[in-house]
């Protein structure tokens, strides 16, 4: 099967996050930030300093390299271990056009340290956060990476590797890893109105008549392609580990997803036991309205009680994400690992890296106590209009191209 082939390919040589439902057939301008915090923002932009950038990136590199590393500043340069230096580029004092013009060969005028901060912190997205799509998400087309045509380039990883080579360092952990995840939008094949709506999505949105036909054919058999047990069996067969994100409640009708976790408590508990039997993780698929409703902690507690396990992993439904608010919500709710940060309509490196990292808190000038595991490839992303003309084999090839870059 395509999914099984893809999983093995990922595990062979990939460090990053990959998501497929298993329940679908893969392949199935001016800065105008809208709010201020006294003393932290100027002209609607984060008030940054060279010291902020230096400290954050020094901590980041310490997590990656086995050898000690120290960054100091002197005469307009970042100096690493008194061995190599990079000119300081104060990107926070530049306008959009300057940033776009000054970025060449994966850096802003040769400043590797500032460039790594720019991408890891999501600075461009943070300062353009008023731009939203119909679901309140920042569009990939408005990202700096998309405007420069580098969304499929792991800029941070490229620069870190250059630094490692120049210093002659080694990585603490250089073994390939795949973070395989499943968003459990549904517990089984939809029926009734939900079934017909899914056919409409297949035909009108995904432009995939064959997928709709297969869905109809499956509805007349006992073979349920939406069964979570199918995913569990796949992990059991291949000896792989998966993370399963369960929804905490039914979603609004226009979002068509979710289920009553109390009503399906026994079924979910049985699922949870099976997932644990293959060393899988159980996480939360955040309510689509989590940015509007102050209930994530309650949702986590509900799932934790049902599955009798601590819920520390999460991802947002529809990849709903607001860089000015989401990390705060995750941190306060007790989420330790999030894997939301990808664009719904494009594969690639939203934060410039395939590796886990701690996001930056612009308000308090510190790292969040949350690890972001970048979502690099999601099945639905390859159903977007950007890839509409690609056939199945070409979509697999697109994923292989991404893998070869990390």
Segments predicted by a language model, with ranges:
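Active-site lining segments that contact anionic ligands and/or coordinate catalytic metals
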Residues: 279, 346, 368-370
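Catalytic domains of cell-wall/extracellular-matrix polysaccharide-remodeling enzymes
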Residues: 14-33, 289-366
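Conserved, mostly hydrophobic/aromatic
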Residues: 183, 285, 314, 330, ...
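Metal-dependent polysaccharide deacetylase catalytic core of the NodB/CE4 family, i.e.
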Residues: 186, 190, 210-211, 229-321
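Terminal accessory/targeting
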Residues: 1-263, 353-356, 362-406
């Amino acid at each position: 099967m395509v999914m099984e082939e893809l999983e093995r390919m990922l595990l062979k040589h990939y460090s990053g996050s990959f998501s497929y439902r298993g329940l679908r057939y893969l392949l199935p301008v001016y800065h105008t930030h809208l709010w201020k915090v006294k003393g932290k923002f100027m002209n609607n932009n984060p008030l940054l300093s060279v010291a902020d950038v230096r400290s954050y990136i020094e901590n980041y590199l310490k997590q990656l390299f086995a050898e000690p590393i120290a960054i100091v500043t002197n005469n307009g340069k970042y100096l690493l271990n008194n061995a190599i230096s990079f000119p300081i580029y104060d990107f926070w004092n530049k306008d959009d056009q300057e940033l776009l013009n000054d970025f060449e060969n994966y850096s802003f005028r040769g400043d590797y340290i500032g460039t790594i901060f720019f991408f890891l912190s999501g600075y461009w997205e943070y300062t353009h956060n008023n731009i939203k799509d119909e679901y309140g998400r920042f569009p990939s087309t408005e990202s700096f990476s998309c405007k420069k045509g580098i969304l499929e380039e792991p800029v941070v990883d490229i620069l870190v590797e250059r630094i490692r080579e120049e210093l002659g360092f080694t990585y603490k952990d250089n073994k390939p890893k795949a973070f395989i995840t499943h968003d459990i939008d549904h517990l089984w094949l939809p029926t009734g109105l939900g079934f017909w709506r899914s056919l409409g999505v297949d035909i009108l949105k995904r432009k995939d008549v064959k997928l709709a036909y297969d869905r109809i054919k499956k509805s007349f058999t006992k073979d349920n392609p939406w069964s979570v047990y199918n995913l569990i069996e796949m992990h059991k067969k291949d000896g792989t580990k998966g993370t399963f994100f369960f929804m905490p409640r039914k979603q609004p009708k226009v979002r068509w997803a979710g289920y009553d976790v109390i009503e399906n408590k026994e079924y979910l508990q049985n699922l949870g036991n099976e997932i644990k039997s293959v060393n899988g993780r159980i996480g939360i698929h955040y309510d689509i309205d989590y940015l509007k409703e102050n209930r994530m902690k309650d949702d986590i507690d509900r799932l934790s009680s049902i599955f009798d396990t601590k819920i520390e992993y999460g991802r947002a439904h529809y990849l709903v994400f607001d860089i000015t608010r989401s990390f705060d919500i995750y941190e306060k709710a007790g989420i330790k690992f999030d894997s939301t940060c990808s664009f719904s309509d494009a594969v690639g490196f939203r934060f410039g890296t395939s590796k886990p990292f701690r996001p930056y808190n612009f308000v308090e000038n510190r790292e969040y106590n949350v690890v972001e595991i970048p979502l690099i490839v999601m099945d639905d992303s390859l159903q977007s209009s950007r890839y509409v003309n690609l056939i199945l084999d070409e979509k697999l090839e697109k994923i292989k191209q991404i893998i070869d870059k990390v």
